A protein has these predicted regions:
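Zn-dependent metallo-beta-lactamase
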Residues: 1-22
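Rieske [2Fe-2S] iron-sulfur-binding domain
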Residues: 19-116
Length: 116
C-alpha cells in the first residue's frame, strides 16, 4: 500500500483536525490531546459538505458488540452535529452510516497516511 506524507506533526494542533487532499479525495486527520492520530473521510453525508476536519473532538461511552461499555473518541460535524467514531468512521447517531477510516502513523515527526 502506498504511503502519503501529510505534514509535520506540529502542523496539527492537539484537539484539532486538518484536511488533506490525496488523489482527489479529502481526508480529515485529527490529533488528540494525547497525540493519538486518526483519519476518516472529510465528507459529511448529512450536510453533503466536506467539513468534518473542522468538527469538534469529544469522547463518550458506547455499548460494543460484546455488550460491554467502551470509551470512544468521536468528531462531531460542525453542521448538524452527528458524531463519527474516529477509529472506525461509524456514525454514533445513525448506525446505517459509516465513513471510511484510514491508517495514520508517525514517521519521526511526520504524519503519514496509508490505505487511500
Amino acid at each position: 500500500m502506498k504511503q502519503h506524507t501529510i505534514c509535520p506533526l506540529n502542523d496539527i494542533l492537539p484537539e484539532t483536525g486538518v484536511c488533506a487532499l490525496i488523489d482527489g479525495k479529502q481526508i480529515a486527520i485529527f490529533r488528540t490531546k494525547k497525540n493519538d492520530l486518526f483519519a476518516i473521510d472529510n465528507y459529511d453525508p448529512f450536510s453533503q459538505a466536506n467539513v468534518l476536519s473542522r468538527g469538534l473532538i469529544g469522547g463518550t461511552t458506547i455499548v460494543n458488540e460484546a455488550g460491554m461499555d467502551e470509551e470512544v473518541l468521536y468528531v462531531a460535524s460542525p453542521i448538524y452535529k452527528q458524531r463519527f467514531n474516529l477509529a472506525t468512521g461509524q456514525c454514533l447517531d445513525d448506525v446505517d452510516v459509516t465513513l471510511a477510516a484510514y491508517q495514520v502513523m508517525l514517521n519521526k515527526d511526520t504524519v503519514m497516511l496509508q490505505g487511500v
